[in-house]
From Swiss-Prot:
Catalytic activity from the UniProt record: Release of N-terminal amino acids, preferentially methionine, from peptides and arylamides
Keyword GTP-binding: no
Taxonomic superkingdom: Eukaryota
CDD domains recorded: MetAP2
Keywords recorded for this protein, A-Z: Aminopeptidase, Cytoplasm, Hydrolase, Metal-binding, Protease
Protein name: Methionine aminopeptidase 2
Species this protein is from: Uncinocarpus reesii (strain UAMH 1704)
Location (main, coarse): cytoplasm
InterPro entries in UniProt: Creatinase/aminopeptidase-like, Met_Aminopeptidase_Type2, Pept_M24, Pept_M24_MAP, Pept_M24A_MAP2, Pept_M24A_MAP2_BS, WH-like_DNA-bd_sf, WH_DNA-bd_sf
UniProt binding sites for a divalent metal cation 1: D220, D231, E431
Basic residues: compositionally biased ranges: 60-75
């Protein structure tokens, strides 16, 4: 998701405090190997005892006693299709796969001993575990979506609900009881942004849109565990004519990740991203289009229960000329880039689906009882996490639009309308969440797909 951020949550991310998790996508299986070794030793002892007994009896026929079969413990369960096995079942020891560990470039590769100690003192042991659990859920769900859900002829509603139902199942929190969604679940509603629409479009109730073979669709959704949000997005196109567009944006995002680090200026990251992206061209129907970075969309910090990091949050530009603000140790960032064959500039358009309660909003008297009741529902079920209209529908809310609009106009809830470039253009997006740990940066949402 691309917007400004609330307050940055600076818990330490020291690499030494969390044991290395098993390989991505597989649960820890160490205990099974140890038990097999013990079984082999006990079997050898049994066989030796049988042999000695046979010698002692002389004429008695030797009989080899069959070893008892013991059940192996610790063997990983396999994820179902569609994904419905909670991740905690697949990883019973809570050792979730770590992300892609990247060394810092040059001047910020070394952190002093005192700094490391300070971060160890402030370390929250659950911090990395929550992030890694959320990231592994994102990987498993998007893998399922790419293989099974996202196909021409499928409705956007079917795709969105398939993704969201899978996320909720893997977190073990379906979000139908009050406050359940605040424990774990969707960290950002599923955006299914087609062609010239770059961001913030999710189907509302009654939506009849169907994915077509010639479409370019951005799939953007977030997962959270205990308020630790991972935000990641990818683009799908079935026609290879769009390959260069997708490659340009993927290259730009990876460039941003490579350049990011402690004490790095946002302006330098933006310049590197733009240079990478705008070195590509796309040929459509005999016309060559330069790929343009969408200059008014940015990456952002991520805070605790805050997709945009808080009132003191930072933005990561994707074009040159940004401010001189620096990244800092302990921060979490969504590095996302958007490319377009159009103007490279987006504006608000179409029906709103995305909303979020404003953190630390002033006390505003509400005249409409429907607005008061709805604000209570939003606060108890989503807090400051973004939500969409379908989430209110599944909680049994109806006829809430008047109250919702009143909350927006009162400044208590933010509306995030879809963002579009010119009609006829095509846009693409890739996004990862990174953690700026003291000695390394961890691309927490990295997978085999992107």
């Amino acid at each position: 998701m691309a917007v400004q951020a609330p307050e940055v949550d600076k818990l330490s991310l020291n690499e030494e405090s969390v044991a290395k998790a098993p390989t991505k996508g597989s649960a820890a299986q160490g205990t099974a190997g140890d038990e097999d070794a013990e079984n082999e030793e006990s079997d050898e002892d049994d066989d030796q005892g049988v042999a000695e007994g046979a010698v002692a009896t002389g004429d008695k026929k030797k009989r080899k006693r069959k070893p008892k079969k013991k059940k192996k413990k610790g063997v990983a369960k396999v994820q179902s299709n569609p994904p419905r096995v909670p991740l905690s079942t697949l990883f019973p020891n809570s050792q979730y796969p770590e992300g892609d560990i990247v060394e810092y470039k040059d001047d910020n590769a070394y952190r002093t001993t005192n700094e490391e100690k300070r971060h160890l003192d402030r370390m929250n042991n659950d911090f990395l575990s929550d992030y890694r659990q959320a990231a592994e859920i994102h990987r498993q769900v998007r893998q399922y979506a790419q293989k099974e859900l996202i196909k021409p002829g499928r409705s956007l509603t079917e795709i969105a609900e398939g993704i969201e139902d899978s996320v909720r199942a893997l977190t073990g929190h379906m979000g139908l009881e009050e406050g359940d969604s605040l424990v774990a679940g969707m960290g950002f509603p599923t955006g299914l942004n087609i062609n010239h629409c770059a961001a913030h479009y999710s189907p509302n109730a009654g939506n009849k849109m169907v994915l077509q073979h010639g479409d370019v669709m951005k799939v953007d959704f977030g997962v959270h565990v205990n308020g630790r949000i991972v935000d990641s997005a990818f683009t799908v196109a079935f026609d290879p004519v769009y390959d260069n567009l997708l490659e340009a944006v993927k290259d730009a995002t990876n460039t941003g990740i490579r350049e990011a680090g402690i004490d790095v200026r946002m302006s330098d990251i933006g310049a590197a991203i733009q240079e990478a992206m705008e070195s590509y061209e796309v040929e459509l129907n005999g016309t060559t289009y330069p790929v343009k970075a969408i200059r008014n969309l940015n990456g952002h910090t991520i805070g605790h229960y805050l997709i945009h990091g808080g009132s003191t949050g930072k933005s990561v530009p994707i074009v040159k000329g940004g401010d001189q603000t620096k990244m800092e140790e302990g921060e979490t960032y969504a590095i996302e880039t958007f490319g377009s064959t159009g103007k490279g500039y987006v504006r608000d358009d179409m029906e709103v689906s995305h909303y979020a309660r404003v953190p630390d909003a002033p006390n505003v008297p509400l005249r409409l009882s429907s607005a008061k009741n709805l604000l209570n529902v939003i606060t108890k079920n989503f807090g400051t996490l973004p939500f969409c209209r379908r989430y209110l529908d599944r909680l049994g809310q109806d006829k809430y639009l008047l109250g919702l609009n009143n909350l927006v106009s009162s400044g208590l809830v933010d509306a995030y309308p879809p963002l579009v470039d010119v009609k006829g253009s095509y846009t693409a997006q890739f996004e990862h969440t990174i953690l700026l740990r003291p000695n390394v940066k961890e691309v927490i949402t990295r997978g085999d797909d992107y």
